[in-house]
Design a protein with these regions (language model features):
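A glycine-rich, Thr/Ser-enriched phosphate-binding loop motif common to dinucleotide/cofactor-binding enzymes
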Residues: 89-92, 293, 355-359
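A conserved active-site cap/scaffold subdomain adjacent to cofactor or substrate pockets
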Residues: 350-357, 368, 373, 377
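Gly/Pro-rich active-site capping loops and adjacent beta-alpha segments
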Residues: 386
Length: 490
């Protein structure tokens, strides 16, 4: 007998739009509505009403209340229309939040969705076309804001123009490379092999955007179609946001699922979750080679489910760049030889901005139903490896459990940041990247450095020759000079 308040995922669907005809291209609202309709059909029941329909914030629509627009198109009468802030952790956070409220008797049916039409929007802008869905609908009532909106960039990072993911995530990988004692070429071969494994999973995934497996050499070698973006990453190692994709999930209480007549073979149980964040700003993180919040949050989610990482047969680690997979594998204690994705990751399965992990969860639900494993684990990440949400899914029911290790994380050491005259002088390179232009040439070097007192400072340089030198050899540990205006002098 399943406890009537047990949360259960009863429906999941994914939508891809590949049309090259802009007249046929549908916007994110239409794609999300198709995903919702598909998730309801996947449940094998008629679901015309829900307590809430919540949308993961999309970068492809400026509609005031996208959830209300999706509900109207999908024919779902929802009591509440929700909208998350930005953050790739949002899909798993939404599942954790809905599961907790279902278990507490506050909710019986939640529809979650997210989607992007970034590819069609980009192509329309390039063609000078103004598609109907590109005009924002401001007529709806304001949505209900859900989740934590977090400022991700320290003012000093903004002032130094260090704000893009491709300017920050590569620095984690450079620090990992130095810590492992690998040369530049050996390290690039290593991460290219990791990404080749992701591409092979995507090639088997019918819902992946790119289903072409790539060799490590194809991924590692810069070229006209695979330029260097942010050293050490070629284009193939970056999340692919140039996609039109949507996904949706339907969660119910067990008693609502029974009342709706949803077959038991559709049920997959979210059994535990955890949500937390690192120190808010990268400037204050103690190290570029560890994610303490992932160490604590993942272990907590697994402990609450009574499982270890080795017990979970299906895993999807967030994968916007190779660094985050390596950091996550080490933090969670996953055997590096294991498959760390069920989709193929953001570079190959597709990176629809904040909503990637909803595709991972939808894929996980399908694989658990098929009997591939009785348990699955999802880690969703937002910001610069900042916000984390973890979920454990099971073929068998269990009481929902959730907790957060945030108090313990907040008590951990943070690194002081110095700027201006306090940063000027000799310093040791801690991590760095070289941002390349569209022509593939070095354009801007960015370094996190440590002062003799152990504080962190930022330094940049736009000399192409210095950028080429930093991309050719190991600079972590070298002594450089920093100027008051954030200049980096070799």
């Amino acid at each position: 007998m399943v406890d009537p308040r047990t949360p259960v995922v009863v429906g999941a669907a994914q939508v891809l739009q590949r049309t090259d005809d802009l007249a046929e291209a549908r916007g994110p609202i239409a794609l999300m509505a198709r995903a919702v309709t598909g998730a309801v059909a996947d449940a094998g029941a008629t679901i015309a009403t829900a307590d809430e329909l919540t949308v993961v914030r999309s970068l492809s629509t400026r509609d005031r209340n996208p959830a209300q627009a999706v509900a109207r198109r999908a024919g779902i009468a929802a009591v509440r229309h929700g909208l998350t802030p930005h953050g790739g952790n949002s899909p798993q956070w939404l599942v954790n939040d809905a599961a907790a409220r279902i278990a507490a008797g506050q909710l019986d049916c939640a529809v979650l969705t997210g989607g992007e039409a970034a590819r069609s929007r980009r192509r329309a802008k390039a063609a000078g076309a103004d598609l109907p869905w590109m005009t924002a609908d401001e007529s709806s009532a304001a949505p209900t804001a859900v989740g934590e909106a977090l400022d991700l960039s320290h003012p000093a990072e903004v002032a130094a123009r260090i704000v893009l993911p491709i300017e920050i995530y590569p620095m984690f990988d450079v620090a990992l490379r130095a810590g492992a004692g690998l040369g530049v070429a050996a390290h690039r071969a290593q991460i290219a092999e990791l990404w080749s494994r992701f591409s092979r999973v995507a090639a088997r995934n019918p819902s992946a955007w790119s289903r072409t497996a790539m060799t490590p050499e194809q991924i590692a070698e810069p070229g006209p179609d695979n330029r260097m973006v942010g050293f050490p990453y070629t284009k193939s190692m970056n999340a692919n946001n140039d996609v039109d994709m949507a996904a949706a999930l339907v969660l119910c209480s067990a008693e609502r699922a029974e009342a709706l007549g949803i077959p038991r073979d559709r049920w997959v149980f979210p059994v535990s979750g955890a949500d937390c964040r690192e120190h808010q700003y990268v400037s204050h993180r103690w190290s570029f080679t560890r994610l303490p919040a992932v160490e604590l949050g993942a272990r907590l989610a697994l402990d609450l489910a009574g499982l270890s990482a080795a017990d979970v047969g299906l895993v999807d680690l967030y994968s916007c760049f190779p660094s985050v997979v390596q950091l996550g594998t080490a933090a969670i204690g996953i055997d590096p030889s294991r498959e760390p994705t069920v989709t193929g990751g953001l570079s190959f399965a597709g990176g629809p901005f904040n909503n990637y992990s909803m595709h991972a969860i939808a894929t996980m639900v399908g694989l658990i139903r098929e009997g591939r494993s009785p348990h699955g684990f999802v880690w969703a990440n937002g910001g610069y490896a900042t916000k984390h949400s973890f979920g454990v899914y099971s073929a068998s029911p269990a009481p929902w459990r959730h907790a957060s290790p945030q108090a313990e994380i907040d008590a951990m050491p943070s690194r002081a940041l110095v700027t201006g005259s306090d940063a000027a002088g000799a310093a040791s390179v801690e991590a760095y990247t070289v941002v390349h232009g569209r022509d593939g040439a070095p354009a801007r070097s960015i370094a996190a450095v440590r002062t003799p007192a152990g504080a962190r400072a930022w330094a940049t340089n736009e000399d192409p020759a210095l950028g080429a030198a930093m991309a050719a050899d190991e600079w972590v540990g070298r002594t450089v000079r920093v100027t008051e205006d954030v200049g980096l002098l070799a």
